[in-house]
Amino acid sequence: MSASSTRPSYAAVLRTPHATRTFTAALVGRLSYGMVSLAVLLAVSRATGSYAVAGIIMALFGAASVFLSPLRAALVDRHGPRRALLPMAALYAGLLGTLAAATWRPGAPAAVLGTVAVAAGACTPPLGPTMRAVWGELVTDRRLLQRAYSLDGVAEELLFVSGPLLVGVLVGFAPPAAGVAVSALLVGIGTLAFVTSPAVKGVAVRASRVRARRRIGRGIVQPVVVAAGVGLSLGAVDLLVLAFAEQRGHGDDTVAWIFAALSAGSAVGGLLYGAVEWRAGTRVRLPALAAGLGLSLAVAGLAPGLATLTGAVVCAGFFVAPALTTAYLVADESAAPGARVQAGAWVNTAVNAGISTGAAAAGLLVGRLPGEAGFALAGGAALLAAAAVAVTVAVETRYPRARPEKQEQQQEQEQGHAQEAGTA
């Protein structure tokens, strides 16, 4: 179920047995997540006639999805992707379908819509963390795994760019609720195709056999801290860019191009990062990449005009996907074999929680502080996270010691292999 290559490349990743089918299925399901936020927001606002109600319901949906993610991931680790993801996807798709039906015409009670949205968010299948755990099973070469994670991260970035565009196309000839319905359909089809892949079936068997007293080691703290710092920075950037453009008389269409430039920079940075043979370890690279993002954003606040700001934002984007890719790699290294989905979910939760918090903080500070100070604070969040992790890495390097979690993971691996040999 694993593959290695003498010349690690993105093509080698996709040539790994079952990789293309599994990855494609996961992307189909994850496209739903790129669509659902805008689709629900538009559908609820149309049904209730209130942007305030739509915003509250969307926030509740997002909170249920984000903060319960580690719990859902733990269920996947415990029961395997097939037994855990299918019920989650069925509930999630069914609830989104209910929400689509309720918002198809105006007049739906806000309380009913909020209840359905929260329930749907609570059932969101952790397809991203599960796919990254599957990459760890498909690819044993760490160099190839870096490319797999980079490819996964860039693809996810593109999904969250193309998802809103797809919603925009749909609302051109159908009610906004159609976007919610399509989102439900995508997650159902994608999850079913994903869990029936031979690669995922193998993960399910192995995950159910591994037992651990301590499933996630202390090493998970470092990637979670960096992910939270990156999320805080990214969450603040959107409002800061919007305020920067408005102060100089530019419209929303111009802002959209700057956001696209950030995503493009992240995609290019992720692909280049994954293609490099790095000598430094992942824990050394992790704070360095977060620091690069923080410095780029701090400098962006000094931009005299929109063109310069766009260039600075592109430079910041170069560090986004690499930083998150490395965070997921470190989380994977820190987790026991049967806890990889949960480890990835903690990083994912940290990013999303950071984005929400950063956006809220920026909303309070924009207009009260100069733009330069706002960008400095946004960059400072990533820099602070980088500094905290760099200190812990330096201490671990200077005072090396055996890590208990590593010993436990080795014992788990030995127990898992012994059980597999006994049942073969």
Language model features: what each stretch is:
Residues 67-81, 171, 268-282, 366:
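Helix-to-loop junctions at the C-terminal end of transmembrane segments
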